[in-house]
């Protein structure tokens, strides 16, 4: 009996085993959370993907697809890690370390990709403004898609343009080419409306009266949407990586004791 207990102790401290079990349970639960959160991102609840797709900077969503794989993999590998720690088998611990390292590298790529492309999109409103001016009212597939997006955002968020209505006046645009300034200086959906979707005062809106015109820009909403996606992919992902690293180091130490 005593010799069996001594043999078990030689194959790894119970404290180390306990740390590995607890650490991997937290990883597997975090992996499930990451999996669920990145599915929410790919569903594009804010419906801003067209803005990112037109610019070619849609890798925030590419990072989300990688994170879906990583979240589920964290769950599976961490579950295996719990079994490896309890079984105290050298081959199982080595397999766990190799698999976790692979998932770790992929998750690093997901976090970095999402964050860098988020920074490109929201660090300066000029890119969003340029897209809006180029594609809004343009007679192309991309133009029609972005026109629908901007119409929806301006109605739902009660905003106009990227920084405000003057975006449509100060710069040339596809909208201006189709609608002279004397007819309407900004899209009619910039006008305040009643509950029945009727403009409060179309002439007052056309003349720029603040009581009848949305004066705030839509960039804050767009930036918030992209930031929300990035938080779910990058910052939560980084938090999981920071927790996983010491667990892997403990597993390496445990491997040397077996």
Curated annotation (Swiss-Prot):
GO annotation terms (biological process): epithelial cell differentiation
Record field: transmembrane: 15-35, 60-86, 92-112, 231-252
Membrane-side (Extracellular) residue stretches: 36-59, 113-230
Main location per the UniProt record: membrane
Localization per record: Membrane
Keyword match Heme: no
InterPro entries: Tetraspanin/Peripherin, Tetraspanin_animals, Tetraspanin_EC2_sf
Keywords: Disulfide bond, Glycoprotein, Membrane, Transmembrane, Transmembrane helix
Tissue: High expression restricted to ureteric urothelium (most superficial cells); low expression in prostate. Expression in normal urothelial cells is lost in culture. Some expression in tumor cell lines derived from urothelial malignancies.
Key word Transmembrane helix present: yes
Recorded topology in the membrane: Multi-pass membrane protein
Glycosylation sites: 170
Database matches in Gene3D superfamilies: Tetraspanin
Cellular component aspect of the GO annotation: apical plasma membrane urothelial plaque; cell surface; endoplasmic reticulum; extracellular exosome; membrane; plasma membrane; protein-containing complex
Residue ranges, Cytoplasmic side: 1-14, 87-91, 253-258
Protein family per UniProt: Belongs to the tetraspanin (TM4SF) family.
Subunit annotation: Homodimer; disulfide-linked. Interacts with uroplakin-2 (UPK2).
Known role: Component of the asymmetric unit membrane (AUM); a highly specialized biomembrane elaborated by terminally differentiated urothelial cells. May play an important role in normal bladder epithelial physiology, possibly in regulating membrane permeability of superficial umbrella cells or in stabilizing the apical membrane through AUM/cytoskeletal interactions.
Annotated protein name in UniProt: Uroplakin-1a
């Amino acid at each position: 009996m005593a010799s069996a207990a001594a043999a078990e102790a030689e194959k790894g401290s119970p404290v180390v085993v306990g740390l590995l079990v607890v650490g991997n349970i937290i990883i597997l639960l975090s992996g499930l959370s990451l999996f669920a959160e990145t599915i929410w991102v790919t569903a594009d609840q804010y419906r801003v993907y067209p803005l990112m797709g037109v610019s070619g900077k849609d890798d925030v969503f590419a990072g989300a697809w990688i994170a879906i794989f990583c979240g589920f993999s964290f769950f599976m590998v961490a579950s295996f890690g719990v079994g490896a720690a309890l079984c105290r088998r050298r081959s199982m611990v080595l397999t766990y370390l190799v698999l976790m390292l692979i998932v770790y590298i992929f998750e690093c790529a997901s976090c970095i990709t999402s964050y860098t492309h988020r920074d490109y999109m929201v660090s300066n409103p000029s890119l969003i403004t340029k897209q809006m001016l180029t594609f809004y009212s343009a007679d192309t597939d991309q133009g029609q898609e972005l026109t629908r997006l901007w119409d929806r955002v301006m109605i739902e968020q009660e905003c106009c343009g990227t920084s405000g209505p003057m975006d449509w006046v100060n710069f040339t645009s596809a909208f201006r080419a189709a609608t002279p300034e004397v007819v309407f200086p900004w899209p009619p959906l910039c006008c305040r409306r009643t509950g029945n979707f009727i403009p409060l005062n179309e002439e007052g809106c056309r003349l720029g009266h603040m009581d009848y015109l949305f004066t705030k820009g839509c960039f804050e909403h767009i930036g918030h949407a992209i930031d929300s996606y990035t938080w779910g992919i990058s910052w939560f992902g980084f938090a999981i990586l920071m927790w996983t690293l010491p667990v892997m180091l403990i597993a390496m130490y445990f491997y040397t004791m077996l």
